[in-house]
Curated annotation (Swiss-Prot):
Annotated GO biological process: 2-deoxyribose 1-phosphate catabolic process; carbohydrate catabolic process; deoxyribonucleotide catabolic process
Record-given protein name: Deoxyribose-phosphate aldolase
PANTHER family, per the entry: DEOXYRIBOSE-PHOSPHATE ALDOLASE (PTHR10889:SF1)
Pathway: Carbohydrate degradation; 2-deoxy-D-ribose 1-phosphate degradation; D-glyceraldehyde 3-phosphate and acetaldehyde from 2-deoxy-alpha-D-ribose 1-phosphate: step 2/2
Amino acid sequence: MVAPSAEIDLAPYIDHTLLDPLATPAAIAQLCEEADRYHFATVCLAPIYVRQAVELLYRRTPRVCTVIGFPTGAHTSAVKLYEAQEAADHGATELDVVVNLGWLKAGQTEAVHQEMAEIVAATGVTVKAILETTVLSETEKRLAAEICLDAGVSFLKTSTGWRGGATVADVKLLAQVARDRIGVKASGGIRTAAQALELIHAGATRLGTSRGVDLIRNRDTLEGETNY
């Protein structure tokens, strides 16, 4: 049974997210202000806005997170590595990296492992592996999670939100693989505080949502959420 929402402070779990390609610098400034006001874990935004966010959140609690190889994961390893290193050089301390799903489905597990391990080693920051669980079989989900865990990532993340969102079942599976050694991030379609709490009780240690402020303010059903 999910505990009453008053028992858990949702704010420290939230990656306050704005990955809309139409996002403007003004919208990013608002995102950062909200994250600081509500003490969210991070702001999660496109690489182009990392420097702006780092400046705005200097000496503030929220960290700066960006996405790598987003949303398809189908960039070359060299491009992903460059993107990750540049983001870290610009001050991002968390990177959400999309796994190469084509390689995974083709059984090219060494390539998946090497790509993720190189990013972890080269940047030295928190790396979250986005597995896109909504398009994977049960076996593929577990395999992807184990590969990324072995590659040294700090979190297993369910999804980009572009192909569906987090489910309780997927969070439980990732938590089983993680076994408290690394974190689990649930992302995509998180609309209510009750849903957020259910995911936390399933094992999520971080929540990616574009509706963090509404979750904190309203704690009831939200309409019209974007899924990323």
